[in-house]
Amino acid sequence: MAGRLFAAIVLVLLAGVAASAPVLAETGRAAYYRGGRTASGEVTGRNGYTAAHRTLPFGTKVLVTNMSNGLSVTVRINDRGPYGRGRIIDVSTAAARELGMIGSGTASVRVDRQ
């Protein structure tokens, strides 16, 4: 009985540690898009702070940081993609403006799940 209780306590403690562990960041290239109908069924415009990611669940919020200038923005995943070679995320026009990447069209970024 004591062995089972000890095992249960250890499992609960390990679950708590796993739940509080920091989520690893993803780094790569980002581009931006001008809006339209998304894979989630939502219609977005240029002014929303949204993004497309291949695997993150819809509704997930991520912090995107432009590695060349340090600017960051929080976006909500509402679409699938990007489908461009070498990219890890596509952000909305408004988010791209905040990241300072409108002129270049793409940027090297870090994506942190929030």
Q: What are these regions, as identified by a protein language model?
A:
Residues 2-13, 17-114:
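Secreted/periplasmic proteins
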